[in-house]
């Protein structure tokens, strides 16, 4: 590991963010810090993750949602201070890393099937 990677790893550890495992196709709820005047509150932005870029401290992800019939996309830096929390609402089955094709689709063709993991979780044993 060179010096730049080492410094970046230290910064990511110092950020202390609890980032769940998610990928393109998953529906995520992002808690965004919004400042209104002198008070700060958390505003949730829920939508489908259509892209994810893993570049250390420069990692980001794009979330797309439909708001009053209009598509809204937002790019969130993963380690930005405005991102308060990330929650995975549901997992989706997709065969692409980038889902930009969803921009041109509406209705049923824009739906993503839910991924069901049949593997046992860490705490429970598999039935044999």
Curated annotation (Swiss-Prot):
Biological processes, Gene Ontology terms: translation
Keyword Acyltransferase recorded: no
This protein's record includes keyword Ribonucleoprotein: yes
Keyword annotations of the record: Ribonucleoprotein, Ribosomal protein
Entry's Gene Ontology cellular component terms: cytosolic large ribosomal subunit
Cysteines engaged in disulfide bonds, as pairs: none
Annotated GO MF terms: structural constituent of ribosome
Classification via InterPro entries: Ribosomal_bL19, Ribosomal_bL19_CS, Ribosomal_bL19_sf, Translation_prot_SH3-like_sf
Function: This protein is located at the 30S-50S ribosomal subunit interface and may play a role in the structure and function of the aminoacyl-tRNA binding site.
Family (UniProt): Belongs to the bacterial ribosomal protein bL19 family.
HAMAP family linked to this entry: Ribosomal_bL19
PANTHER family, alphabetized: LARGE RIBOSOMAL SUBUNIT PROTEIN BL19M, RIBOSOMAL PROTEIN L19
Official protein name in the record: Large ribosomal subunit protein bL19
């Amino acid at each position: 590991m060179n010096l730049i990677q080492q410094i970046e790893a230290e910064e990511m550890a110092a950020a202390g963010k609890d980032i769940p495992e998610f990928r393109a196709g998953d529906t995520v709820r992002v808690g965004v810090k919004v400042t209104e005047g002198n008070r700060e509150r958390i505003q949730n932005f829920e939508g489908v993750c259509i892209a994810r870029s893993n570049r250390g401290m420069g990692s980001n992800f794009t979330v797309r949602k439909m708001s009053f019939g209009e598509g809204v996309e937002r790019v969130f830096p993963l380690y930005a201070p405005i991102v308060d929390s990330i929650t995975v609402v549901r997992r989706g089955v997709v065969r692409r890393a980038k889902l930009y094709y969803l921009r041109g689709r509406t209705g049923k063709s824009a739906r993503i099937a839910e991924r069901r993991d049949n593997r046992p979780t860490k705490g429970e044993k598999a039935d044999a």
